[in-house]
């Protein structure tokens, strides 16, 4: 009996020590993450997971990997979580979100399909699937997914907004405006909805009314960067070059690192004949957003490309 007691007692002691070590590493990692010591947090979480593949700890590790831009390492953790808890759609949605940040739209689409296969009643699964479809240049599929999301959640503001944007990209102004009006019923001060409404009205109806909507947004939020871009562009379209430059100047006072504002101010300066000033702004825009440099031409005629991936 003494031998058996010591044998099983030793096993219990070892298990208890492992549990203690795991807890210390896990919570040291969480504390390190909170105070920004991310390298140490990764070390703690990795060692904790070697003891026990705890889903919460793995989620923390994947998040920290993302924070330090180790995207492949983060993806591997999310995938492992889907393997450990394969019946939980939330892990597949977390993987989908990660794929979106990595611009892996095919992987995002697959993760969403698996989440929907596990539970067809999660609105965000269809919303994320729509974002994947947009990334894959499939607007029709995006609209179908957003419509399903809205059927499950009638006040799903993000889904209405995205569907309106997709419809407007297809120049379906009437349908887009219906979604915008629904958004404004939900929240009459929805800045994104008001700006999109202004953008559509500027093209299809009345530039003066569009300007009123843009100014309304700037009154509510003087830091709304897209509002400055739309206002400046509207003034440029009306040949009000000096006023447009003044709008971009104001935007740059608020955010000196606003690459799109430099680009648009350069376009305005070129229209005014200030080639030197235009070139300076173009160079500054490329300096701030080098990934978009190849999309900026000397004529500034491709603004859409510059803002393609801006999360407005």
Identify the meaning behind each predicted range.
Residues 18-56, 60-67, 94-103, 131, ...:
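Alpha-helical segment of the N-proximal tetratricopeptide repeat
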Residues 60, 94, 128, 162, ...:
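Canonical tetratricopeptide repeat
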Residues 52-53, 86, 120, 154, ...:
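Short coil turns that delineate tetratricopeptide repeat
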Residues 22-23, 55-56, 89-90, 123-124, ...:
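Helix-start (N-cap) detector for alpha-helical repeat units in TPR-like alpha-solenoids
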Residues 33, 66, 93, 100, ...:
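Position-specific recognition of the canonical hydrophobic site in helix A of tetratricopeptide repeat
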């Amino acid at each position: 009996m003494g031998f058996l007691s010591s044998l099983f007692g030793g096993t219990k002691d070892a298990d208890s020590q492992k549990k203690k070590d795991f807890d210390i590493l896990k919570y040291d990692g969480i504390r390190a993450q909170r105070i920004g010591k991310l390298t140490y947090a990764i070390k703690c979480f990795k060692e904790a997971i070697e003891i026990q593949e705890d889903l919460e700890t793995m989620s923390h590790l994947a998040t920290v990997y993302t924070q330090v831009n180790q995207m492949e390492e983060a993806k591997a953790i999310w995938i492992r979580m889907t393997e450990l808890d394969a019946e939980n759609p939330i892990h597949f949605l977390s993987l989908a979100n990660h794929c979106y940040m990595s611009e892996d739209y095919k992987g995002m689409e697959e993760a969403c399909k698996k989440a929907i296969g596990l539970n067809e009643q999660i609105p965000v699964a269809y919303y994320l699937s729509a974002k994947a479809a947009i990334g894959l240049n499939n607007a029709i599929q995006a609209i179908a997914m957003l419509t399903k999301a809205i059927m499950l959640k009638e006040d799903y503001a993000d889904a209405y907004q995205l569907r309106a944007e997709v419809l407007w990209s297809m120049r379906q102004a009437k349908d887009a405006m219906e979604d915008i009006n629904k958004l404004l019923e939900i929240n009459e001060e929805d800045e994104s909805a008001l700006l999109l409404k202004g953008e559509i009205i500027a093209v299809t109806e009345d530039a003066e009314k569009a300007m009123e909507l843009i100014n309304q947004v700037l009154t509510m939020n003087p830091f709304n960067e897209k509002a400055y871009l739309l206002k400046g562009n509207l003034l440029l379209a009306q040949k009000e070059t000096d006023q447009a430059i003044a709008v971009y100047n104001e935007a740059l006072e608020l955010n000196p690192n606003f690459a799109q504002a430099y680009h648009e101010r350069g376009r305005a300066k070129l229209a005014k004949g200030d080639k030197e000033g235009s070139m300076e702004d173009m160079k500054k825009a490329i300096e701030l957003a080098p990934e978009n440099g190849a999309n900026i031409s000397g004529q500034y005629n491709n603004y859409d490309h510059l803002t393609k991936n801006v999360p407005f």
